[in-house]
Amino acid sequence: MNVPILRLVARRIAPLAIGATTLGAAFVGAPSAASGVVMHPLVADWAFVGSSPTPPTQAQCNAATSAGGTARPRRCFNPTSMQNSYNISSLLASGNDGHGQTIAIIDSFGSAPIASDLNVFDNAFGVQHLCGEANYTCQPGDPTFKILQVQGSPPAVAPPPNNGTGLENHNLWAIEVSLDVEWAHAVAPRANILLVTTPTAEVLGVQGFPDMMKAEQFVIDHHLASVITQSFGAGEETFGSAASLLNLRGAFQAAPGAGVTVLASSGDGGTANAFKTPIKNPGTIPFPSVGWPASDPLVTAVGGTYLCTDAVTGLAIDTASPPASCQAAHNPSGDHDVTWPGSGGGYSHVFGTQPWQSAALASYAATNQTGNAPLSSNRAIPDVGYNASPTSGVLVYSTEPPVAGLFCSAGTPCSSGWYVVGGTSASSPQWAGLIAIANQMSTGSGGKTMGYINPALYQLPSSDFFDVKIGNNQTDPSIPGYKAAPGWDPATGLGTPDAAKLIPDLIAYVNSH
């Protein structure tokens, strides 16, 4: 079956067309300063590991070469081992699999073969098929896969591949789309997936970020999803002024009243943000900084870790072939997760103190970590963590566009097939899957959707999380990072989810407040 595609026409005045979805109001309040903001998909690193529809073996993953040409042994997590690692499997076994809920995934460009790639992924791992996949005959009651395309006005025009702007990053966005769709689906296999795409590259005129926010507003206004995940971002300082950033928040302000949870990847540069033009030679903000939309207090920011469990089964801590950061020399207590240095985190320079977070920030300050970046009482991220390290990455099947460009030199990553992928882009969609499960469980018992979860997260028992106490998120030697510590910290948030405990407790809190 062909994937259903809806098209959202972004014009100030647009008639309702049969067979297409239109939006009659242009994005309101988009500042000119936002037009130059460079946002990237938050895929940190990837390695091609095989072209066969059959998933690669762990030996193939260990021999993988990264996109930059470096041999980096890595472990490849599959859906079952990831579900076991974060105690999601028992929920799925009880029928709590996101049924009846819809996850909206926001991405640039999209990927034309995603319906086929998703089918390969589901066949390979025995995951529930979605109605809308290629090469699949829908069955009654199947969850769905649909695409909502935001059509820009004027339409996006692809630049020459060597113009230096980086607008040709279709390959990286293709991997991003495959990662987001396949892994939100892997966590909540019976949730509907709505892929929302814009035709805009990172800095295409006045489109870019405003198009993304307009798409999210449409999803919320038309009740198309109960959870939104976004795996892109830009440093707060790249917006030129706080006002130009604040004018983009309309969707986030509408989400709580609609009962919609909004999540975002916290970033892959630790405390260093380099989302500035020109893309090929970006500057670095010369002090610790955080990225938006993750820094928005109305968004749940998801940071990154090294997952130290066995990648084949996920049933125990890996003592045979763990990545270096999980080995005894660095992780003597055998912790479940340790900090991935790329985990975006720190304190906002735009958003002030959040009452629901102030106690956690004070507790972290009291740990008196030496060598830290400056502390603050402002909004801090991430809120929570999840596996994101490329050396403990997830398997993604992606058919890459046959074009040359910034991320396609020497055929990398233009090959189509299996990749092992890392970055907080892997973290946010999987948390979205968890929220879809929570929404199913709650509404199925007469409760409400989780909606705005940030205040609730900070009230949950610490036992609902795998606490991350080792490592820091410094990636640039000239920009200090933050050390992990017991409880919340600006590297991994409250920790990673022990889903079988966390989700029932989150449901109970949300429905009692």
Model-inferred region functions:
Residues 33-301, 348-422, 428, 443-445, ...:
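Substrate-binding/charge-relay-adjacent region of secreted/lumenal peptidase catalytic domains
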Residues 2-34:
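Secretory targeting and sorting signals
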Residues 8, 12-13, 150, 331, ...:
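Positively charged, low-complexity intrinsically disordered regions
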Residues 297, 301-353:
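Polar, glycine-rich mid-to-C-terminal structural blocks
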Residues 426-439:
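Active-site-proximal alpha-helical segments within enzyme catalytic domains
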Residues 368, 438-490:
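An often Trp-containing, charged/polar helix-loop segment at the C-terminal end
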